[in-house]
Structure formats: C-alpha cells, structure tokens
C-alpha cells in the first residue's frame, strides 16, 4: 500500500464514528469464530443477562472488562469466541406479566397456562431485544451468529438430557421437604435465592400448661402464629431443670391439642428458657427433629401466606395479621409472660422482597453432595478453576462444603417444564403425592415408557412446574457450544478460558456451573474465574434499584461516547476484584471521570491529526503502516535517530511490556492507566513538542524523515495498544492513518498486538531523559512563578558537579532551549546542593548586618584593652591583629553584598524545594534578583532583572505567603480540635490533613522564591 496520507476531521465525533464501526464489524462478521481454524482457543461465554432487563452500570462494567480481554487475546492471534445470549428469567418475567394482568383485572390462573405462555413469548419478542441492542451500543466484540437463549431449542434439549440423566443416576428425586416458600411469587426458592437481613423484632414468651395440671413450661419464639402447628416441646436431655418433665404432655393453648415433652441434643439450654416449641412443618431444625421423633407435621399456611384450616379461628388471615391476633388471644387467656426486643436474622426472598416461610412441600431436588464433591476434588487436586483474586477460592470452597440438596422445581409456567409425566389414570385423574410418573426427554418418549408400565390406556399429564432458572444456567458454558452433541465448537472452545462475573453470584451460578460441568463433561467449565467488584456511586454506595442511585450507562454514552465510558470503567479498577467509584453530578447529569476519558480521546485525536498533517511527502508504504509488521522501527538508510527518537521508542516498548504483563495477570486498570500516561505524557506532551522544530519545511531532511517515521511508528503502535480499551476511536484513526479503502474489510481489531522488543528498551536513556524533562519542567515552573511572559526569552544557568549529568544536559540543550523558551543556556560545574534545616527568614537584613558588625568590632576592642593591662607587649600585638581581623571579617562577611547574602543564608536559611526524588534541598546560590530551583543535583538559576517587575513580584509573593500561612493556621486549628478529628468522617479529616500539608509546602516554596529576590 503506497497511498498518500490524508488527515482526520478537525473534531472527533464519537457518536457517528461508533455507530459506523459497530455496523462495519457486524456486517463483515469480524468477530465470527471458526473452530476449523488454527490458533490457541480463547473462549468466553457471556454471563447471560435477563431477557427482561435493560442495561445497567454493572452490565456495562462487566462487558467492558470482558471485551478488553477478548479484543486483546484476539489481537494476540488466539482463535477467539465471545458467545452472547440471554436468560429467560422465570420469576422476573412472571412478575412483569402478572403486574400487567393485574392492571387488566385478571390473574394468570384465569388466563390459563397456554395463553400465558403465548403472552410471554410475545412479550419476549417485543421487549426481549432491548438489552441485546444496548450491548451492541457498547461495541462488544461478540459473535452474534451464535447468540443463544436459555429457552431455545438446543438448550431445551440439553436441559432435558441433563434432567433425565441425573434422575436415572438417582441424583434427582421427588420428595416432601421443607422448602423456602415465597408468598409473593407463590413459589419455592432455593437457598441461594434467599437473602438474610438483620431486623429489630420481638421475642415472645408464653406458658404451655402441663396436661396433669401440675404446672407449666415457658417457651420463647419470634413467630407466635406457628404455635398453631406445634406438635411437641423439646428440652435438652442434660438440662437438670426439665429432666423430670420428659415424657409428660402439655395442652397447647388455643387449639387444646395434647403434645409431648421430648428430649433432643439439638436444644440449646442457654437459649430462651431452655424449652423449645417444635413446629416440624415450618422450621428446618424442627423438621429434622420431627423426623427423629416421629412427630406429626401440621402445615398451617396457604401458598399465599394466609393461614389455612389448621389455623382454626385465624384461618384466612395473613400471617402477620394472625401473629398479632394470636399474641392478643394468648394475652387474654393469661398465657403471655413477656415480650422482649430482639434483634435477629430473617430470610427474605431475593425476588419477592418478602420474608420467606419454611413450608412443607413436595418438590423436585438434586442430590447435591456427589456433584459438589467432584468440584471440590478439581479444586483441591488441580486448583481448577483458578480464582482471580485468589481470596475468592475460599468463599467458593466453603459454599461447596456447606451445600444441601437443591430444590429445583418452581411453581411457575414460564421456563423449562419439568420433563416428568404423571400417570393420572392411576389416581382418578389427579396428580397427588402418590401418583406414579415417568421421566423422559420428550413427550413421545414419555408415552412409550408409560405404556410399557401402565398399559395402552394410560392417561398422562406433565408436571406443571418449571425448573429453577439456575438449572439451565448451570449448563450454559457447554450447552451453548452444542452439548450433548459432540460439535466442532465444543471440541475447539471447551472448556472455556475465562469467566468474568461478580462475586454476588459465585453461589447462584459459578458453583452450579462447575458441579454440572464436572458431572457431565469431566472437566471444569472454565480455566479462570475473574471476579470483579461493584460499581459504586459518587458517595461510594452500592448502586441498586432500592437505593435509587443507579446511573444509566446509556445516558453517559449519549453524552460522552461509548469509548469514554468503557475506558473510565476499566481505568478505575485499582486491582482485580476491587470495587470502583464512578463520579457523577446528578443535578447536572455530568460525570467528571467520564468527561476526563472523553478529553483523553480528544487528546489522542488531535495528536493523530498533528502526526498525519506532518507526514506529507511520505506514503503508507514509506512508513510501513498497515502492513501488520510494525513490531520494530526501521528508519530509512542514512536516517539517524535522535536522542528523543530513541527515548520515545524505548518508552513505547517499555509500555508494551508493562501492558502485556498487566493484562495477562488481569491488571486491566493498571494497564489502562499506563497507556494513558504514555500517550498523554510521553507522546503528546513531550515527544511531539520535542520534534516540532524537526518537522519544519526548512529542517534537515534526514532528521525530518526520522521524526516522521518515528511519529508514524509510535502512533500506529499506540492505536493497537489502546484498541482493546477504546475500540472505536482507535479504529477510526487507524483506518485513516493506514489509508484503508472504504470497501476494505481490513480492521484494527484483527491486527497483531504489539510485542515488546527488549533490545529497544534502554532504562539508562530513559533515566537521562527524565533529567532533561525535569529540567524543562523546572524552568517552566520558575517562569510561571515569576510571571515571565509566555513569549519572553530568558537566560538559564545550570550547575552540577556530575560530569555525566552535564553531558546529558549538553546533549539535550536544544530541547531545553526550545521547550523552555531559553535564549541563553549555560551548563557548568557547581557544588551539589546540601540538605538544610528550614529557618524563618528575617526582614531588615542590612540593618541586622550593620548591628552585628558593630558588636563584633566592639567586643574585639574590649578584649584587646584587657590584655594590654596584664601582658606586656601582647596588647599591642593583638590590637593590631584583632582590629585587622575584625575589619576584614566585617567587610568580607557583613558589608559586601554577595558575601553578606552568603553569610545570612547560613543563619536564615530559606525554605527549600523538593528535587525529583523528594529530598528537601537548599536552593542554589543565586544572583541578586533571580529565581532558582533544583532538579536532582542540578541547580537551576534564572536571572530576572529586566525580565519582570521585581517589586511587583515581591509584593505578590508576600501576599501569597500571608494567604497560605492563614490557610495553614486555620487547618491546624481544625485538626487540633478533638471534636472534628473524632467525629468528622475519616475522608474529611484526611482531606484536611492533606490540605494542611499542601499549604505548608506552598508557604515553604513561596518563601524560597521571595528569598531569591532579595
């Protein structure tokens, strides 16, 4: 390719650009995976968002992280597949549709199952694509040709296969068990769908009278209404207080049922009174106790949370209404002893947002222990999967150890209907707990099995319940690749490489996937689990619907562009697994952090425009652009690289090395920050500025060409480095830089990621260049502090005893003069500055000098007079020597202006500046009316006479010192107040401390400046 390079538009338009390239990538199937191609596979399956959902900031954060990894590995040459899809979300869909039906005055039961499912599919078709289209706006590099849905035909086949297989192996069973029941959704929920909340409640104490009239026992409970289902009272067999009561009976208040007093080791003698009411149908511990002691199981609740006929006079009342009425009745009858305030934990339904009830119910269960043990074996023997950060391994392991059997049936209609068919002809056309059934992969298979067992006239009815959504989600990593069929996708891309997900679904999803995969495929479903943190709001609070503090990512995309949001979310990650804080002004609908990323995009755009504007006369072929072979820079014959060229190339390869290391180890935030600092700082602020003079038309042709080639080489490398983080703007610039034809299918997304050439990394050169940059920056700062006009040329004197540093300064003197606007630059040997102790500068230095001179002269005269009286001839000698020495001392050290300044500096040492390494050092010896600073061991002095108005500058410095001292004193006062330090938020106190340190530093610097103006 030898096209002449044209330029970019003057302004970057993210909205047009992003839409253009998203369309291009999808239409050209850039991200379509091919299992028949070579290359090490890199596969990620998307954590499927609910089909009901819309994009929230958590989705955007997770998608940005995944896409960064996927794009990086694709550019590394791996055979990459990111597989998209959505989850059918049974409970969420039911919640939405049943609200709609309620508004119409209907229920789903009135509508009927068939009509309800028709409405569900219709709703999915109309609204289900919302989140998919929103994901497209994020520019995610997924293979849309492989998009899956957990209710599609292939996944339904996988679900049936898994269910039947587990049932045949005895790992799925139907049984009566105590389940978590959500009255709001009227469905069982699994343990991991239950959220425990600490609440302020009550502990009620009641008397239960002994049937023989000899007394009573006292029990305590947080759920008084459940006493209507009590079938015993239990005590610990070792509790001497109650041993004599074991075997006796009690008469239950209200119901008048006679119940036994039993002994059980489970009872804690220290809890309450040591007597525990036993309600086997409504408490898990009581359920186990009831089975051990063969107690009756009395269910008092309907599925909607009201009391059933076993509630007697309270039947039909809501559980919480019944609670109040039961307490009132017991108080009236004299059985209420006391009510205590009691803080305790209450289980809530994650979906229904109401307290769940332990309810005795016939459900389908997975026998979880054999599956969990396989996952534990992989973890303990092979550290598979590997968790990043590693601390989540223990959380995952503890969960696997403590699992109990998984209730997988849900009393819903939208979802995978349980593949079990009841022979209702055997139980008078009704499904009962005793109705025989067959389990099959299809209706036809069910009929064949049923006919062989029950005869040709058998009548079948499929189980009305559906499977827990997490059952199908647990199969996601391999069912989406074609399992149970042995497909090319499954062979190439399974097990998948990385799972990126939040810590909050390790229990819901990650453990389920590893158990299912371990059982059905004999492998863990992914090599690495990268656990990310939460996106927190501007006040560092977790974003949630209930807190109403979420930030719509689409709003930020519409305001700043997709790349700006993506880059912000990734850059803010301080370390793997850490939460991020997103700055946001809700009144203005503005995000300073995303705005900063947009500014970064604009900075890159303007830098690219500058580079292209200065590549005239050269073609893409001359520059080696777009060839895919830009790992090393080959300058034209006879073109010598300058010091700046060699420095930027070294820095570029150092950044490649660092970026690759960070991404390979999931340090995405560190990688993003490193690229940012290189582009904004090294490339834009320094290298481009350093080469501007070499790009002039009248510059040396060879030097100009070297600058052009280096600029083009580094710019293309920058675009590749940054592409995984900001894909749209980098694609747009790269297409223009490499002059791709409009109909070309070439894309930056498929270019090779830069590889570091360690031979081009020169740490010594980078250190040397740091000295030049530090010197330029110091001169610029001194100019600004002295208010030297921007266009004014100045004199700068540099002194250092280091021969090597003088050589560096001399080699880079043209850079110093150009960038610091120095007309005359001297570089000379000089003493290295020494560390000093700061003392307060004094005023009236001339007066003080004269007074000291007079005192010294007088003291010497008196000493000589005393000596004359005591030692012959000695007085004359000392009179001559003493008076002569005194005259020399006063003249040399107090009256001569330059010497006076040196003398006073020893007593009234000026405040000092920090050098590059942070050591506080004395300012260099400066000429009168000059300003000075230090960088490393180099002393920088800028004479100001004739450049600025010294008196005006001195007055301004004195005012600034006074203001800074006042601020520092105010902050000291606040920080010395115990009420402020102890009661103010920690971040506010720290901010005050930081402000004080900054104010004191400012005072120190300003005093130094004032001293050099004396």
Swiss-Prot record:
GO cellular component assignments: cytosol
Task: State the SUPFAM superfamilies in the record.
Answer: Anticodon-binding domain of a subclass of class I aminoacyl-tRNA synthetases, Nucleotidylyl transferase, tRNA-binding arm, ValRS/IleRS/LeuRS editing domain
* Domain of life, per lineage: Bacteria
The family database entries (Gene3D superfamilies) matched by this protein are listed as:
HUPs (3.40.50.620), Isoleucyl-tRNA Synthetase, Domain 1 (1.10.730.10), Valyl-tRNA synthetase, C-terminal domain (1.10.287.380), Valyl/Leucyl/Isoleucyl-tRNA synthetase, editing domain (3.90.740.10)
**Can you state which reaction this protein catalyses?**
tRNA(Val) + L-valine + ATP = L-valyl-tRNA(Val) + AMP + diphosphate
- Stretches of the chain forming a coiled coil according to its record: 947-1014
Q: Which GO terms describe its molecular function?
A: aminoacyl-tRNA deacylase activity; ATP binding; valine-tRNA ligase activity
What is the similarity comment for this entry?
Answer: Belongs to the class-I aminoacyl-tRNA synthetase family. ValS type 1 subfamily.
Q: What is this protein called?
A: Valine--tRNA ligase
Q: Which organism is it from?
A: Nostoc sp. (strain PCC 7120 / SAG 25.82 / UTEX 2576)
Top-level taxonomy: Bacteria, Bacillati, Cyanobacteriota, Cyanophyceae, Nostocales
Gene of origin? Answer: valS
